[in-house]
């Protein structure tokens, strides 16, 4: 009870990505679960993961392949980030076989889904970060690059945009960014932070603005991008 340490818990889930690219779906789940902890002050070296696979029948060859690629991503990302899986839970055959109101045979299967949970340690509550900017003089920095990767997003669904590229995790770059972020936080260079996730940068900035009750002034014209053009 005399320790200054804190525990962080988070998760990542992107079921809409599975039918497009189950490997990068799983990679995004892992990266998000980790990144959500990093921005609270957790050090990457303390992070561990748990998986929860909820899948339809693997007797369907397509679903089995999606499962294989998702599991491969778990293996690859766990090694790349040096974040071990310490537990997990799998639920298979989530299918309904029955009849509709006209007595016709039907089969309803859940979207193949992976939930990644994460746990990490903040070495001291003095390094704990929230999403609330502390001062009207705070500067907003965006770490990392964005790309023309909106496949599986709500935006693409609403506006019927045909983009079959889901976000890709650049493991080495992400790991370096997370370690640099932690060093900056330990040196008291960061006052608040948020992880960009579902809804993208707009939602992340909106959350910070609402939390601060002051608003934010941002200019995204020079945002770093992976691709030359963002449609």
Regions found by a protein language model. Give the residues of each.
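Glycine-rich phosphate/pyrophosphate-binding loop regions near the starts of catalytic domains
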Residues: 1-148, 153-163
């Amino acid at each position: 009870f005399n320790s200054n340490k804190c525990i962080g818990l988070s998760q990542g889930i992107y079921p809409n990505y599975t039918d497009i690219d189950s490997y990068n779906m799983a990679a995004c789940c892992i990266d998000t679960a980790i990144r959500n902890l990093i921005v609270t002050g957790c050090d990457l070296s303390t992070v561990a993961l748990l998986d929860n696979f909820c899948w339809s029948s693997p007797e369907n060859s397509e679903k089995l392949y999606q499962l294989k690629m998702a599991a491969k991503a778990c293996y690859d990302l766990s090694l790349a980030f040096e974040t071990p899986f310490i537990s997990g839970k799998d639920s298979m055959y989530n299918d309904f076989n029955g009849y509709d109101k006209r007595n016709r045979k039907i089969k309803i299967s859940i979207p193949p889904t992976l939930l990644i949970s994460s746990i990490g340690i903040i070495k001291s509550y003095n390094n704990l970060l929230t999403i609330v900017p502390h001062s009207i003089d705070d500067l907003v920095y965006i770490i990392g690059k964005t790309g023309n990767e909106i496949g599986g997003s709500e935006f693409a669904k609403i506006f019927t945009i045909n983009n079959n590229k889901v976000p890709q995790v650049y493991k080495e770059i992400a790991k370096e960014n997370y370690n640099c972020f932690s060093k900056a936080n330990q040196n008291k260079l960061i006052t608040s932070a948020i992880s960009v996730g579902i809804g993208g940068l707009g939602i992340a900035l909106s959350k910070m603005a609402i939390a601060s009750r002051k608003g934010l002034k941002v200019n995204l014209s020079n945002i770093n991008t992976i691709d030359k053009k963002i449609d």
